């Protein structure tokens, strides 16, 4: 089992943090100490490392779509100034189909192929347009504006060829640059994919190998997916159809295949839920439904928020996304949970690490969650892979925090006991 160390320093509230990720890791500390910053930064870092080629393709396909946008303006001119009876010759339906394919595809090779086909269609279209239009001078003027050129045209055919050759070159250069970026893996490209995050003091190592150096970055080998969610924003994920997390809840993993041992946890979660979570069709799309064992059926977004917390884990497991090569990051998993259910949730997290091997990072400031994980991890024999970190204010700046690894949870509970002291203080006569 690979071991990971995640470090971040001098960033927002974080003075220094060096976090082991070799099992189940808990970040504890007061509000504003940087726990969520650590979680979100790790998510974005790991997402770039695990999905680098897909992210490069996504950016490049977006750039290709932007490069062909002027062709939509050409459509407007042609529809206005070329006789409508000629439009059937211009294969408008095929053109619209190609545009839609470019807009939807996430594959760079396909986007380049569709774009070059589209350009060829427009080359034919404009060549014929100049032959049939009665407004040739006006058409020339409009096209020069669309393509932002002041070039004097020796003839219409040369102008059309020049414009589309330049567009073809632009498409090919976008694809060529993307392919080279995949090979080079330069630090600058990495920085571009993590906007608004200072990575100068950021590092992740895998089995002792640092993945970021001065000029390049290396691949993660044994982490293939990262999943991150904030429990206090549970309801938002059910409506965000563009997010990765939404797809994890609704779609089965392409590599879906569960071992017998991996089936045990979903069964345990069904027992806790008292039912199942299934997809259902509605007029405007789909939704998740909670089917209770006594026959009750309601949309999941109308269920208790605590039940939704467990439902998310159930869906991630059943859809095949929580594996030994997954990093799961959860902010404040105890949010919305009754103390009894906090203990159950802690047990699921410990068993998820023990039985499946998923690496887990959570942030928490709840004593029940911390104590439950500590006790259950010891009982299940995984305490050596359970790491507790506590954020302490820096000696030089009370607004900057150092995350220190704890041999036991005593220091964490000392911080929780401050609340009891305050209660006594404010409650005294």
Identify the residue ranges that each predicted region occupies.
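Phosphate-coordinating catalytic segments in nucleotide- and nucleic-acid-processing enzymes
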Residues: 5-7, 48-325, 394-429
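Switch/communication elements of ASCE P-loop NTPase nucleotide-binding domains
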Residues: 1-51, 290-427
């Amino acid at each position: 089992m690979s071991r990971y160390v995640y470090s971040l320093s001098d960033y927002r509230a974080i003075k220094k943090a060096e976090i082991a990720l070799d099992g189940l890791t808990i970040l504890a500390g007061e509000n504003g100490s940087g726990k969520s910053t650590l979680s979100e930064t790790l998510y974005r870092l790991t997402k770039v490392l695990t999905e680098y080629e897909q992210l490069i393709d996504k950016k490049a396909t977006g750039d290709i779509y932007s490069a062909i946008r002027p062709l939509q303006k050409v459509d407007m001119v042609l529809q206005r100034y070329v006789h409508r009876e000629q439009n059937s010759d211009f294969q408008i339906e095929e053109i619209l189909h190609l545009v839609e394919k470019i807009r939807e595809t996430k594959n760079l090779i396909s986007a380049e192929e569709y774009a070059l086909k589209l350009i060829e269609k427009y080359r034919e279209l404009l060549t014929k347009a100049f032959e049939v239009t009665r407004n040739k001078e006006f058409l020339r003027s409009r096209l020069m504006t669309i393509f932002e050129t002041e070039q004097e045209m020796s003839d219409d055919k040369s102008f059309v060829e020049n414009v589309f050759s330049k567009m073809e070159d632009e498409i090919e250069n976008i694809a060529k640059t993307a392919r080279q970026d995949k090979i080079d893996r330069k630090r600058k490209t990495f920085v571009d994919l993590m906007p608004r995050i200072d990575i100068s003091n950021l590092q992740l190592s895998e089995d002792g190998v640092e993945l970021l150096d001065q000029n390049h970055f290396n691949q993660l080998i044994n982490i293939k997916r990262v999943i991150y969610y904030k429990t206090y924003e549970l309801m938002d994920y059910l409506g965000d159809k563009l997010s990765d997390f939404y797809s994890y809840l609704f779609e089965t993993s392409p590599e879906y295949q569960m071992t017998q041992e991996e089936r045990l946890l979903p069964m345990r979660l069904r027992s806790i839920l008292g039912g199942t979570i299934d997809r259902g069709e509605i007029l405007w799309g789909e939704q998740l439904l909670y089917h209770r064992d006594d026959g009750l059926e309601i949309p999941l977004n109308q269920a208790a928020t605590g039940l939704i917390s467990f439902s998310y884990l159930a869906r991630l497991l059943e859809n095949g996304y929580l594996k030994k090569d997954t990093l799961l990051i959860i902010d404040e998993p105890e949010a919305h949970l009754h103390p009894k259910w906090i203990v159950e949730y802690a047990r699921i997290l410990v068993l998820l690490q023990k039985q499946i091997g998923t690496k887990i990072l959570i942030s928490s400031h709840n004593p029940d969650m911390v104590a439950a994980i500590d006790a259950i991890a010891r009982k299940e024999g995984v305490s050596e892979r359970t790491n507790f970190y506590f954020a302490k204010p820096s000696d030089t700046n009370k607004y900057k925090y150092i995350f220190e690894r704890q041999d036991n949870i005593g220091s964490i509970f000392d911080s929780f006991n401050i609340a009891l002291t305050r209660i006594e203080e404010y409650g005294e006569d």
